[in-house]
């Protein structure tokens, strides 16, 4: 009996451990300005995840190349990675960005082409980037997003997210990215009423200019929203990558946001 119980626990533990891990990171101005050393640091930080969603890829020359450099560096870590990059968003010229996804091909399969939101691309300045993946026999679609800055009132565009689950009723949506807005804001209430929950509550994710009294994080901007009826959170966390640097100024050469992640199972 004890052996049976032990085997069951081992199998359950192995099953949970093998579930997909998704990380989201706003990597500030990911483009030609990032050195090979900085790209290598990013790869070392991200290599243990299965899907990477990136915001703030430079729209012009150097952005797509930086993602390719990151994929190349990840491929040196022992697993095979692939990637896809969005077209520039339809925002004003100086606000245009790209999004990117990278994924371990042994863990998940990309289904079809990734695409930028079409219906609300005028209402949302940097319209979100969708990509459908399959893990075992179940599919889910990650919706990668970078909102306008806080002083420009990101809630004025996040409010359109309440229409997306119905618009894509055949998809299991996971919203990730930099919302420049805390999950407690009432703009998220319609999504919550539809069964969506945030992975993080009260977790600050942007870097201060300087640490004060040991506190280095400024605002609760980045998050992940999942449909609680179809997805179960197994584990989650943030990566305090800045602790590897002597100062926040040095750390900010990588990014002014920290990566956020969660591991999940599909019901």
Protein language model annotation of sequence segments:
Residues 21-24, 50-56, 84-85, 100-101, ...:
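Structural recognition of the beta-strand scaffold that forms the well-ordered cores
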Residues 60, 166-172, 181-267:
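Metal-dependent phosphoester-hydrolase catalytic domains
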Residues 129, 133-200:
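Extracytoplasmic, non-cytosolic globular domains
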Residues 27-32, 57-61, 88-93, 106-109, ...:
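Solvent-exposed loop/turn segments at secondary-structure junctions
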Residues 2-9:
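Sec-dependent signal peptide recognition
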Residues 2, 16-99, 155, 159, ...:
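N-terminal, active-site-proximal structural segment of metallo-dependent hydrolase catalytic domains
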Residues 18-22, 106-109, 123-145, 267:
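Beta-strand-turn-beta hairpins that frame and shape the catalytic cleft
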